Amino acid sequence: MKTNEWISDVPVYEPGKPIEEVARELGFADVSEIIKVASNENELGPSPKALKAMAAAAPEMHRYPDGGCFYLKDKLSAKLGVKPQNLLFGNGSNELIEFLGHVYLGSGTNLVMSECAFVVYRLVAALFNAQVIAAPMKKFAHDLDAMLAAVTPETRMVIICNPNNPTGTIVSSAKIKSFLKKLPAHVLAVFDEAYFEFMPDDKKPDLIKEIQKGRENVIVLRTFSKAYGLAGLRIGYAVGHEKLIALLNRVRQPFNVNAMALAAAL
């Protein structure tokens, strides 16, 4: 059978072992003695309100979820000060990164990222047979000038994880504003803000304002996995220009966000 040849070169993500298995191998009787640091999970767990909402939703699990995330979209758009059309939800922000790959990446294209950043960016680029250009960092922080210098006519996206995973460094609002002024209009700036809620308020860049102003080549990705402790439910969201969100919605499968995740996030 004929297949897409490059798929054989896509690396397979290898998840860590379950804590229970690690405990068994190391001879620990109590799994609470082991702390799993690889996935940056919130050890406080979900909010009691989220647990209550999930319990209330459980009897309706025979129903398909709200495919348009209507109520969550309505509530979150009001909180962020954007229109519902500026929002898209995914099965974790990982799925949203894959949506971006569907829309922007392919053979002969590339994405620019820092040399030490979230592994999924490389996996998604490989999935669509796109090149990764890894820009050098300064003291484990994004060097936005180096990232700009790496942009070519074939570049479709520049991905900035802020705060960065795994180095934990933050790019200032001033540097981001300067970066956006210089970024070519044909390139999408993707800001992965999975750890946004952990930043001090005076360090948080307000990229939502760029979207409110109508800027088309900026998208912000956030998640309920980290600060809200809902990693096991897989729910994240994108904020972007409504034209961009409409394109991403075309590659989204129906019912991609499960009903339990919707209940907990709401």
Residue ranges, per PLM feature:
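PLP-dependent aminotransferase class I/II
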Residues: G68, N217-L266
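Short beta-strands and strand-loop turn motifs
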Residues: K36-A38, A134-A135, M157-P163, A189-E193
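Short acidic capping loops at alpha-helix termini that bridge into adjacent secondary structure
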Residues: S32-E33, K83-L87, S107-N110, E154, ...
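Active-site pre-lysine segment of PLP-dependent enzymes
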Residues: L144-E154, P166-A189, E193-A227
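Phosphate-binding glycine-rich loop
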Residues: H62-N110
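PLP-dependent aminotransferase-like
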Residues: V103-I160
